[in-house]
Amino acid sequence: MSQNNLNGAQVVIECLKREGVDIIFGYPGGSAIPMFDALLDSTIKMVLSRHEQGATHMADGYARETGKVGVALVTSGPGATNTFTGIYTAMMDSIPLVVLTAQTTTPNLGKDAFQECDTSGMTFATVKHSYLVKDPNELPRVMKEAFHIARTGRPGPVLIDLPKDVTAGICTAPFTEEMNLPGYKIPGTAPDEMVEKAAALINKAKRPLLLVGHGAMISDACRQVREFAEKLNAPVTSTLLGLGVFPSNHDLSLGMLGMHGTVYANKAV
């Protein structure tokens, strides 16, 4: 798609396509009209929810099942605030999510305009990062950064607040692969000396036990966990989100830990 004469909403939709998005979940409203208009000419499928909270949970569930970034699209004010439970669920469970919230026009920000709220500010503690876009030319970079942040490191939700004049305005900036994230550091692998130290401590352990969590699931380490447990002959217990990493019918399985877990798993730990 050519960059010529595209408005902000069309740029957002094109960026979604470039990130491999083929389905989004949402509920329309006045400030989001440019976004929904842009979807009419797109191959991206729109799944209409009956409530914005439902749209966010649907995007969350889609991300859990497919491993892709889930995308939700809602309108301003109550549409945005209705997403907060779904956003925080994704944050706590490390689910990659991009939530697009419409907003009043930029000249009306901070003036108690109709359905205006500080969406990016209110979600600051419940997302990996939040954006308030005030210039259509920022959209290509912001979209690229948002998906990168959502899916890398410990996955999680990113919110992009889109004023109506930004999605309706013309964007002249090119689509880009460049990002400006000087403070965003993705943890690397552990140094060899740290791995060797951990291995030495494990070898000295008299009663080793493995506690398996969600990280093993999202890193696709199920086979390695099983091989490690069998080599150590160590019992394995799991967090709620780690269920499924280790076979529950295995002789070394103690089941889930915690208040809803098994007695013997809790006593073993």
List each language-model region with its residue ranges.
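N-terminal alpha/beta PP-like core and its mobile active-site loop of ThDP/TPP-dependent enzymes
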Residues: 2-269
